[in-house]
Every structure is written in C-alpha cells, then in structure tokens.
C-alpha cells in the first residue's frame, strides 16, 4: 500500500530507506549520509513546468554535515554530484509515490549546469523537480528537469534526469 501524501518528514524519508513507506516492492531512498534531503514539502501529479508532476524537497545546511570536513580541507563546499544525486533520488521517490515497484537506478541526464555552490554558511538547499514524462509499463521510468537552489537562488540545473525502476538488477 502506497503512503501517498503531499509532503513527507525526515522520519518518513528514513522509513522509505527501510522499504516501509511504499511497501516492500517500492523503491527505497538511500539511507544514512546518502539521503540528501530532510523533507519533501510538495508532491503533485500535475503542476510543474510541464503540468505532469512536481516535487519540492529541502535539505537543512549546517557546517557539521559530513561532506564539508572532506570536500575540501580549508575550502568546504558540498560536492555538486550530491545535488545531482538528490535530484535522481527525488525522481525515484516520485515513481514510488505513483505506485511504481522495483529498485531505482539513475539512467542518465541530458545536461547539468553549475552556477553556484553550497557553502557551510548556507541555511537551506531546495530541490525542484518538474516531470516531463512518466512511463509505467514493463519499464517504469521518469524523465524530469530539476533545479537546486541555495537560500532561494538557483545554483544547478539539470535537464532530462532519467530514473528507472527495476525488479531485477542482476543484469543492469
């Protein structure tokens, strides 16, 4: 049974990592340090730039986050790939929210642009995912554009984020 709401807390997202939110067949989010959001503030089946679905999530920033101590010593910055991964995580989460089953795998991205950075002095990172297409046949796949914002300013954009759900990943 899919727990389908408009918003989710950190505890809900952690439960997703244990396959407790969307059922045993639903795609789990990463757990621990690789979970790149603290809450999902909005999910809709319509809306967004293409009126085919929208997700908005947030990550609270503080200087004690794990990546600031190692990326880089004396020049702490959140790795851009973590923001990209967060967008892929949200595409997979949305597919589970729609009732899709399987293990999520990032399948690609058309283009990524970085125009800013997340420093330990920031307060909040926001992610916005605008769905272009959802395929729900033998293959379950989402295609979306995304934005990463720091304290309200867009700093990364990604086009054609692709995530698929796979019931068997052995041949992946």
Curated annotation (Swiss-Prot):
One Gene Ontology cellular component: cytoplasm
MF (Gene Ontology): (3R)-hydroxyacyl-[acyl-carrier-protein] dehydratase activity; trans-2-decenoyl-acyl-carrier-protein isomerase activity
Keyword Lipid biosynthesis: yes
Transmembrane feature ranges: none
Catalytic activity: a (3R)-hydroxyacyl-[ACP] = a (2E)-enoyl-[ACP] + H2O; (3R)-hydroxydecanoyl-[ACP] = (2E)-decenoyl-[ACP] + H2O; (2E)-decenoyl-[ACP] = (3Z)-decenoyl-[ACP]
Pathway assigned in UniProt: Lipid metabolism; fatty acid biosynthesis
One Pfam family it belongs to: FabA
This protein's name: 3-hydroxydecanoyl-[acyl-carrier-protein] dehydratase
Gene: fabA
Organism encoding this protein: Erwinia tasmaniensis (strain DSM 17950 / CFBP 7177 / CIP 109463 / NCPPB 4357 / Et1/99)
GO-annotated biological processes: unsaturated fatty acid biosynthetic process
Quaternary structure note: Homodimer.
């Amino acid at each position: 049974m899919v727990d389908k709401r408009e918003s989710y807390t950190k505890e809900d997202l952690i439960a997703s990592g244990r396959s407790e939110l969307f059922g045993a067949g639903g795609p789990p989010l990463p757990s621990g340090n690789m979970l790149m959001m603290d809450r999902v503030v909005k999910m809709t089946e319509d809306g967004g730039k293409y009126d085919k679905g929208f997700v908005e999530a947030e990550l609270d920033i503080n200087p004690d986050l794990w990546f600031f101590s190692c990326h880089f010593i004396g020049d702490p910055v959140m790795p851009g790939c973590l923001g990209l991964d967060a967008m892929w995580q949200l595409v997979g989460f949305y597919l589970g929210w729609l009732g899709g089953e399987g293990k999520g795998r990032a399948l690609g991205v058309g283009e990524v642009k970085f125009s800013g950075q997340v420093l330990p002095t920031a307060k909040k990172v926001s992610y916005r995912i605008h769905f272009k297409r959802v395929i729900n046949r033998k293959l379950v796949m989402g295609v979306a554009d995304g934005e990463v914002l720091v304290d309200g300013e867009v700093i990364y954009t990604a086009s054609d984020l692709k995530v698929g759900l796979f019931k068997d990943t052995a041949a992946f």
